[in-house]
């Protein structure tokens, strides 16, 4: 099999990024519109921050966060319970030959941003940045 000449770095390829973004957008739309036939899931507001795909595009990991940050484990259970219906909706809307298997994790980006902001607001760090 020929090696991809356009991607030598350790990060994801352009195709992985593009497919991940299409899946993220589709998941967000499906969850926002309430297209899933689960009243518990439809009453929640869920943010899909990022979707990362495996190099072979067989697995997609969606990083999600419920609005307000409360009930994270419940949201993961609800999404896992409705995974097949979400996967079917993604398959219809994306037109991919194979729809990736969905996995869900809590998005911790906002927590890391708060920690970083807190660090930058410390007096010692501010002095170092100003010098």
Swiss-Prot record:
Compartments in which it is found: Cytoplasm
Keyword set includes Signal: no
GO cellular component: cytosol
GO biological process, one term: maturation of SSU-rRNA
One protein family per Pfam: RBFA
Keyword entries, A-Z: Cytoplasm, Ribosome biogenesis
InterPro entries: KH_dom-like_a/b, RbfA, RbfA_dom_sf, Ribosome-bd_factorA_CS
PROSITE patterns from the UniProt entry: RBFA
Any one GO molecular function term: ribosomal small subunit binding
Record note on quaternary structure: Monomer. Binds 30S ribosomal subunits, but not 50S ribosomal subunits or 70S ribosomes.
Purpose of the protein: One of several proteins that assist in the late maturation steps of the functional core of the 30S ribosomal subunit. Associates with free 30S ribosomal subunits (but not with 30S subunits that are part of 70S ribosomes or polysomes). Required for efficient processing of 16S rRNA. May interact with the 5'-terminal helix region of 16S rRNA.
Family: Belongs to the RbfA family.
HAMAP family on file: RbfA
PANTHER family cross-referenced by the UniProt entry: RIBOSOME-BINDING FACTOR A, CHLOROPLASTIC-RELATED (PTHR33515:SF1)
Protein's recorded name: Ribosome-binding factor A
């Amino acid at each position: 099999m020929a090696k991809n000449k356009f991607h030598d770095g350790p990060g994801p390829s352009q195709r992985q990024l593009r497919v991940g973004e299409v899946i993220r957008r589709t998941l967000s739309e499906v969850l926002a519109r309430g297209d899933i036939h689960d009243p518990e899931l439809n009453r929640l507001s869920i943010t899909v921050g990022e979707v990362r795909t495996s190099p072979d595009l067989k697995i997609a990991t969606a990083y999600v966060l419920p609005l307000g940050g409360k009930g994270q484990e419940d949201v993961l259970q609800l999404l896992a319970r409705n995974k097949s219906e979400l996967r079917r909706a993604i398959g219809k809307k994306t037109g991919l030959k194979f729809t990736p298997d969905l996995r869900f994790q809590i998005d911790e980006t906002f927590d890391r941003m708060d920690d970083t902001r807190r660090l930058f607001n410390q007096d010692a760090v501010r002095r170092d940045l100003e010098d």
